[in-house]
Structure formats: C-alpha cells, structure tokens
C-alpha cells in the first residue's frame, strides 16, 4: 500500500465484483496519493508527539512540558515585569498607601479582578457577602486584620442552636430579642422572654450582642444583617446554623499585591490622609 505495486484485481467495468442491494457495486478507485501521504505524515507526527510530550500515565515526555508549568512560567514572567511598579509601595504603610492615587489605581484593578465577583463592583456586597464600605467588620477592620483576611481567608461557622435554645416558641422569642437589640420592630413581650434564652448565643456574640471579631461573630446590635433580616430569617439561622467562607488569596496574589489591596480595602471605609507631594 506504500508503493502501490499490489493492486486489487479489477474487472473490465472497474469494479471489485462486490454487489449489494442488487445494484450497489464497489468501484476499484485507489485512494488519492495526497491522502495516503497525509496519513503517513499523521502517524509519524503522532509518534514524535508521543515521545516529546506527556501522553501515557506518568510519562512526562522528553521535553518535560506541562500546561501547569507553562502557566507558572507565564505568571513568573508577569510578576517579574510588574515588580518595579510594586517596589515603590513596599516602604509605605496601608494607611499611607490609601492616600496615594497611583497605589489606589493599582488597588482598584486588583479589587475588580479578584474581589468584585463576590463583594460587587461598588464593594457594597450582597446577601452573605459583606459590605466593605461601611464600618461593620466580622473579623476586624484595621489594616493588619484585613491583610490576614486577604492572605489566609476566613471560615465563619454559626452552629445550629435550636435545640440549645429550647422549643420553637423559645427560638421565636430569641429572634425578637435579637431584633430588639438593633432597635428593629419587635414584640416587646417576646423579646423579654427571649433575653433569658439568649445566653446560648452570648458565648460568641456577647451578652450585649455586639459580637466578637476574634471569632468572626457578627454584631447583632447594629442595623447590618448579612444573611437576611426579620423574624423568619433569624429563626432559620438559629435552627439551621450558617456557614460562610472567604477564600485566602496568598496562592493567587503576591505579598506586595496583597499589601496594596489591603490599603485599598481599608480605604473604602476610612478617610485616608492625602499623600505628601
């Protein structure tokens, strides 16, 4: 089939003699030469490719190439190119960077590329995603706490406490007490009854309901309701608990990038002093 010296014996009418469905015959037309050559080239290419690149099991190929390695090389090249930009920010504190227009321009781009998907382009968040422009912080709002959050991430867990609180009526009473802490409309009688049962919640939120940043326990005495407001929303959280997570960015952003992003996030809820010329 390579040299073309072996051919199927053809009849006078250029058929192989095979007939189907009474009149369907197989013609003795050879494959085009270009098709045969292309097939041979394809086979050779596949063999060479299989030797050079990863193909079977743990075989890594002669070149040692991988898509992960190529991606990392491109990331390293990019980090090398932008290193001079961040070098001028390294000696400044987050508070100082927050007043530096060029640094905040970089910080805004970092935020839009890595944070806006959850917290929104205006940083005002959404249900279950905190508003970064107010003064309400689950884990602390100083630059050090923000940098820790960005670097390591946070895991917030509110255990289901319905059984610990008591009966469904007890849970409802606690919900009204929680609403009363922030001055929200509530049943004063139920709120008074729920106060005694609130001790099951006070271990994290405190007896005054103002929360504990060390635990990520929200302040229940303000008007910020991250996971929904109202009797039914609070009852649902008390009975079922709540889990929320903020992914760490250390594996995605460099330390210098996190430093600038910290300043940007801190500046969203603070008024930084303008940078000195």
Give the positions of each predicted feature:
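Hydrophobic alpha-helical transmembrane segments in multi-pass membrane proteins
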Residues: 42-45, 121, 156, 207
